[in-house]
């Protein structure tokens, strides 16, 4: 970049400049925030982590006769300007992502300088910057002195009017049909180029002294109504999708769709709805109603935090399933430990009192309906082999590669509770024997549940499934620590400090004993299948809860959120289905995941129509 003294306007940033905020790791400036919002609105399909959008001119990708200022948005010429050999250009920081579908930027002519030999356009990486855009291969430009367009050639073609000081020239790239058109002062000038390649950079070139231009990559509203043009093309692309020819096999197509819907309902245990749908569409149900209801009952137990009962019920309905899926068993046991800390598992529920100091702050999962997004996360492995869940909490740590049934060696740092002597080995039936002591009223009410209402929980009085008193403790995943020295008499009686197991000594001892059994199970699995880092992390996370007097407000307290039960529930449900030779994921979700992945591949291949055919647009 040229020295500040050589740059007109240097030191006078304009509103929306990208250079001011965020320097030194600070917060983004209001201008940067507004730019981000506008770009997100214009190009919602672009993943800016993978393919950043152009936001300014590149100080590293320019000829040395070019000077930059005002957040690298202002370009001025500082060469001799004797002939075409003194031409100079600059490219934007990033190429235009194909996922934009339609991309637009504007350039304001601050001064035409001596002769107004200015070019605005596009160029590929590596094109000579000692030339105006359009003169070389993979370079395209609209020049102000004669109004000609230059398409990879030194010979221009008549295109539009000339432009000079005060004019605003826009450049629109249509990545759907590979064309480009320009605008002048908000009015379209028509198609200038066709058959454009992918990965082009916004480019401007200057040639004579005094020439100054300002770029607008979205920092300010555009003169041209680009959003109206985008709406037009969105309608065209979606019309193509809607008009896809299937009339020749309409009956077959309808049957496929009906089977997909039916299998989705069955997968998630909506027994009554699946039965009614099958009756209306004459679609066969691939699973017996009794089995669906059994899975429904098990899912309900997990989502209520009664994991020990869910394990026992699974062993009763599906003998051998957990014994042949040690990873799943270990995940369930870790989740059971978390729920014992939470006070919802019947192992401690019958021991601890339901006093105001009790830790049962989460009444149940706030939503039992599956959460779906348009991305390939539909295709994630929720089975027993998946290492991505830690106690049912989606891990943010680096992914590990594991064999089908690996397991960890014991970690001495997992918890003080695991340091005590434990059996040298423990078989699965023994490790599950602790689940047999359950409250009888739970099983009696479970037998009466026969419809989809089984899968509904009463969480209306608890926003997001959390008691109101929790809102002051957990905010956006940030846990506020309280001074443990505070005199309890000064605390608000309406919000007493919660204690592990409500302060019940017997329940606390039961948790510690269960932790030892869990440690022993981990060691046995480690001997049989080898070390498993995912298991080690599960133990460390779960046992860490015991290090805090108030686990719900500690840094690892998010494990206690009922929403973290859902990955465990999904893994168990998928394993049950797989054991019955049924798909572990419903075909509908696989189709959505495949569609999302296809759109990503289209973007990487430079097919811009992917931006206007988002899966989100078809999910209501």
UniProtKB/Swiss-Prot annotation:
Keywords: Acetylation, Cytoplasm, Nucleus, Phosphoprotein
Residues of the B30.2/SPRY domain: 35-222
Region of interest (Disordered), residue spans: 1-41, 347-458
Keyword Aminoacyl-tRNA synthetase: no
Keyword Repressor: no
CDD domains listed in its UniProt record: SPRY_RanBP9_10 (cd12909)
InterPro entries: B30.2/SPRY, B30.2/SPRY_sf, ConA-like_dom_sf, CRA_dom, CTLH/CRA, CTLH_C, LisH, SPRY_dom
UniProt superkingdom: Eukaryota
Function of the molecule: May act as an adapter protein to couple membrane receptors to intracellular signaling pathways. Core component of the CTLH E3 ubiquitin-protein ligase complex that selectively accepts ubiquitin from UBE2H and mediates ubiquitination and subsequent proteasomal degradation of the transcription factor HBP1. Enhances dihydrotestosterone-induced transactivation activity of AR, as well as dexamethasone-induced transactivation activity of NR3C1, but does not affect estrogen-induced transactivation. Acts as a guanine nucleotide exchange factor (GEF) for RAN GTPase.
Protein name (Swiss-Prot/TrEMBL): Ran-binding protein 10
The organism's taxonomic lineage, starting at the top: Eukaryota, Metazoa, Chordata, Craniata, Vertebrata
The gene coding this protein: RANBP10
């Amino acid at each position: 970049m040229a020295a500040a003294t050589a740059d007109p306007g240097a030191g006078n940033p304009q509103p929306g400049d990208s250079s001011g905020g965020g320097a030194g790791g600070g917060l983004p400036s209001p201008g940067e925030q507004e730019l981000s919002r506008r770009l997100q609105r214009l190009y919602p399909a672009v993943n800016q982590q993978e393919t950043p959008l152009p936001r300014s001119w590149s100080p590293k990708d320019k000829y040395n006769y070019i000077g930059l200022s005002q957040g690298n948005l202002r370009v001025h010429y500082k060469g001799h300007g004797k002939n075409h050999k003194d031409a100079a250009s600059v490219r934007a920081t990033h190429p235009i992502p194909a996922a934009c579908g339609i991309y637009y930027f504007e350039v304001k002519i601050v001064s035409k300088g001596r002769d107004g030999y200015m070019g605005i356009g596009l160029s590929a990486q590596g094109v000579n910057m000692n030339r105006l855009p359009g003169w070389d291969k993979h370079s395209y430009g609209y020049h102000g002195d004669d109004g000609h367009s230059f398409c990879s050639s030194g010979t221009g073609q008549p295109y539009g009017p000339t432009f000079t000081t005060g004019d605003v020239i826009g450049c629109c790239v249509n990545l759907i049909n590979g064309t480009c058109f320009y605008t002048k002062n908000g009015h379209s000038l028509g198609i200038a180029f066709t058959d454009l390649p992918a990965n082009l950079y916004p480019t401007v070139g200057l040639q004579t002294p005094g020439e100054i231009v300002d770029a607008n990559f979205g920092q300010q509203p555009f003169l041209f109504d680009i959003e109206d043009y985008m709406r037009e093309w969105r309608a065209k692309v979606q019309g193509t999708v809607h008009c896809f020819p299937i009339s020749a096999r309409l009956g077959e197509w309808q049957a496929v769709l009906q089977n997909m819907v039916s299998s989705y309902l069955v997968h998630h245990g909506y027994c009554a709805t699946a039965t009614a749908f099958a009756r209306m569409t004459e679609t066969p149900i691939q699973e017996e109603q009794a089995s669906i209801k059994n899975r429904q009952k098990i899912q309900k137990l997990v989502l209520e935090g009664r994991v020990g009962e869910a394990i026992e019920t699974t062993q009763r309905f599906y003998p051998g399933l957990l014994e042949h899926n040690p990873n799943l068993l270990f995940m369930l046991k870790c989740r059971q430990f978390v729920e014992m800390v939470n006070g919802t598992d019947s192992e401690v529920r019958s021991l601890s009192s339901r006093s105001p100091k009790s830790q049962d702050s989460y009444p149940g999962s706030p939503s039992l309906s599956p959460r779906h997004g348009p991305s390939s996360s539909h295709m994630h492995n929720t089975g027993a082999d998946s290492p991505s869940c830690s106690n049912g909490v989606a891990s943010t740590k680096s992914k590990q590669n594991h064999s089908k049934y690996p397991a960890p060696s014991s970690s001495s740092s997992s918890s003080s509770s695991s340091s005590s002597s434990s059996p040298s080995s423990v078989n699965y039936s023994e490790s599950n024997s602790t689940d047999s002591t359950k409250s009888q009223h739970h099983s009696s009410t479970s037998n009466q549940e026969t419809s989809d209402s089984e899968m509904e929980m009463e969480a209306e009085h608890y926003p997001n499934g959390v008691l109101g008193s929790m809102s002051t403790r957990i905010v956006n995943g940030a846990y506020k620590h309280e001074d443990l020295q505070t005199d309890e008499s000064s605390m608000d009686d309406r919000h007493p400090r919660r204690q592990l197991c409500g302060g019940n000594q017997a329940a606390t001892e039961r948790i510690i004993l269960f932790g030892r059994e869990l440690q022993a199970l981990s060691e046995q699995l480690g001997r049989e299948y080898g070390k498993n880092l995912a298991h080690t992390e599960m133990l460390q996370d779960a046992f860490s809860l015991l290090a805090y007097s108030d686990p719900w407000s500690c840094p690892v307290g998010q494990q206690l959120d009922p929403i973290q039960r859902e990955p465990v529930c999904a893994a168990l449900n998928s394993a049950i289905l797989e054991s019955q030779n049924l798909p572990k994921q419903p075909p509908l979700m696989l189709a959505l995941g495949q569609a999302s992945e296809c759109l990503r591949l289209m973007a990487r291949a430079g097919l811009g129509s992917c931006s206007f055919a988002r899966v989100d647009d078809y999910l209501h």
